[in-house]
Amino acid sequence: MNEKHLAYLNLGSNIEPEINLVKAVKQLHEYGDGEIQKVSNAWESKSVGAAGPNYLNACVAFISPFVQAELKERIIHPIEAQLGRKRSANKFLPRTIDIDIVLFDDKSYNDKVWKQAFVIVPLAEIYPEYQNPLTKETLFQTATRFRQEVWMEARPEVLSQFKWEKQ
C-alpha cells in the first residue's frame, strides 16, 4: 500500500454548514494515512433539487494510499457518520455533511459534476487547469461560465483557519 492516490473531494452541508464543513476538513486533516494538499474557499449556493437551506460547499485535494472504494469505506463514510450523516433514498434531503469523490488520480470520477456549479466553482479554485475530458474546457472556464449563470457567494471566513493548506 505504498502507492499514493490524489483525490479531489467535494464537501457539502446545509445543516449547521459553518460548523460541519470545518469539522469535516479537520477530520480529513487528522487522518493518519492521508494528507490534505489544498482547500478551496467555502461557497454558498441555493439548495438543488428541493427546497431547503442554502448549502456551503468546498473542495479538498487529498492524498491517501487508498483506491476509491477504500477511500469511501475507510475515510469518507466514517467521517460522514461521525458528523451525523443519515443516508436516504431521497438525495435532496438536508444533510450535515456529504463528501463526494470528484476526481481521482486525474480522472473524472462522475461526469455529472460538470453540470454542478456547487462542485465546479470550488474545484476550479484549487485545480483551474484541469480539462473536461469530453469538451476540453478547463475548470476555470466552466466555473467562470457558471458564476455568470448561477448565484454563488464565496465565504472565505468559513475555512480561513486552513489557509496554510490553500494555494
What are these model-derived regions, one by one?
Residues M1-N2, K112:
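Short, flexible hinge/linker loops that cap or flank conserved catalytic cores
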Residues E3-Y8:
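Extreme N-terminal starter segment of soluble prokaryotic enzymes
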Residues L11-S13, V60-F66, L103-D105:
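Short beta-strand-to-loop capping motifs
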Residues N14, V39, V60, D100, ...:
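Residue-level signal for inorganic ion chemistry
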Residues E16-I19:
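Short N-terminal binding/cap micro-motifs at the start of the first secondary-structure element
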Residues L21-L28, L71-I79:
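Short amphipathic alpha-helices in soluble, non-transmembrane regions
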Residues K23-Q68:
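Short, surface-exposed acidic-centric catalytic microdomains
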Residues V48-N54, F66, E73, P78-Q167:
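Flexible, gly/pro- and Lys/Arg-enriched active-site loops
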